Design a protein with these regions (language model features):
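N-terminal Rossmann-like NAD(P)+-binding domain of SDR-like oxidoreductases, especially those catalyzing
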Residues: 1-167, 171
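Short, flexible, glycine-rich and Lys/Arg-enriched loop motifs at helix boundaries
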Residues: 38, 169-187, 197-217
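Short amphipathic alpha-helices and their capping/turn segments at secondary-structure boundaries
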Residues: 59-63, 189-197
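Short, solvent-exposed loop/turn segments at secondary-structure boundaries
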Residues: 84-85, 140, 177-182, 287
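Short-chain dehydrogenase/reductase
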Residues: 90, 138-146, 181-189, 218-219
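C-terminal substrate-binding subdomain of Rossmann-fold SDR/epimerase-dehydratase oxidoreductases
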Residues: 195-328
């Protein structure tokens, strides 16, 4: 099959491209480069610079490359920014997806994988979040992802297209230093940045109902996340047209913010310098969000293989590639 991977020049997208190629699939990368880097696109892989809001460019790309399936990763994804710029997020994430689905269904593509998020769950009050846990997003970003799931499912049902929504938990790590996340919007790179600048990492709240009082999250290595896309793509092919899947992509194991910062101090060699400063809670931070990974394991025979230490170590190698002054 030939897969169009939107956002394929981004951090996660580049890993998905790599996994699909290794699985023997043909890939076309489609990215507007607002946050992506064309250097992440492998040699020999067709690259089209374009927006999912550009119907004409989408139509031409789908026709030129004979696209059979789509992995849609292109989106705006910063929670705080979505609160400040909600209409921008709805335009990019919802209207952009609508435009893409219109083009894809017109072109006759048969498979569609949608990059969703654990943000659709909002503030779940359960030990393990299953795919049937109620979805009550608490910010525009999460709302756009839930609306996206609805649109993808409805389009698939109407047009006989096999669809899947993959709800990512906390993505970390890197397959290679060159593919590492260069942003500082997630916990691990945020701690790296603080340590590099000579500042203490920050914990927002240590009075949660968790073992050490700090928030607990489920971290997934980006390489495992990428392999999950291959597993889901294979499942859609096996199950046929009209299939719809919704799956959590996580490890099913919680790590507290304090535990993660301590591990970062150990892996990076910063040790005592990684002792965090504790500030008051941020509004809207749930105490615990950890995936139940049972559906991926039992129905698709997929499990995450890499542990949290591998995530931190590989992310650190990437950070030091771009910030050599950070290494001790």
């Amino acid at each position: 099959m030939t897969w169009l991977i939107t956002g394929g020049a981004g951090f996660i997208g580049a890993h998905v491209v790599r996994a699909m190629l290794e699985a023997g699939e043909q890939v076309v990368v489609y990215d507007d480069l607002s946050t992506g880097d064309p250097a992440r696109v492998p040699d020999g892989v067709p690259f089209v610079k374009g927006s999912t809001l550009d119907r004409g460019m989408l139509d031409r790309t789908l026709a030129e490359f004979g696209v059979d399936g789509v992995v849609h990763l292109a989106a705006k994804k910063q929670v705080a920014e979505s609160v400040a710029l909600p209409l921008h997020y709805y335009r990019e994430n919802v209207h952009g997806l609508q435009t893409l689905l219109e083009a894809v269904t017109t072109a006759g593509a048969r498979r569609f994988l949608f990059s969703s998020s654990a943000a659709v769950y909002g503030l779940p009050d359960v030990d393990l979040v299953t795919e049937s846990t109620p979805c009550t997003p608490i910010n525009p970003y999460g709302e756009t992802k839930l609306a996206g799931e609805w649109m993808v499912r409805a389009a698939g049902a109407a047009h006989g297209m096999a669809t899947a929504s993959l709800r990512y938990f906390n993505v970390a790590g890197a397959a290679t230093a060159q593919l590492a996340d260069t942003g500082v919007f997630n916990l691990i790179p945020m701690v790296f940045e603080k340590l590099t600048q000579g500042h203490a990492p920050v914990i927002f709240g240590d009075d949660y109902a968790t073992p050490d009082g700090t928030c607990v999250r489920d971290f997934i290595h980006v390489d495992d996340l990428a392999s999950a896309h291959v597993a889901v793509a294979r499942a859609l092919e096996a199950r046929g047209d009209g299939t719809d899947l919704t799956v959590n992509i996580g490890r099913g194991e919680g790590v507290s913010v304090r535990e993660m910062i301590a591990l970062i101090g150990e892996v990076t060699g910063y040790g005592p310098d990684a002792e965090p400063t504790v500030l008051p809670r941020r509004a809207g931070d749930p105490a615990r969000v950890v995936a139940s990974a049972d559906r991926m394991r039992t129905e698709l025979n997929w499990t995450a293989r890499r542990d949290v230490r591998e995530m931190v170590a590989s992310a650190w190698e990437g950070w030091c590639l771009y910030h050599p002054e950070a290494r001790r």
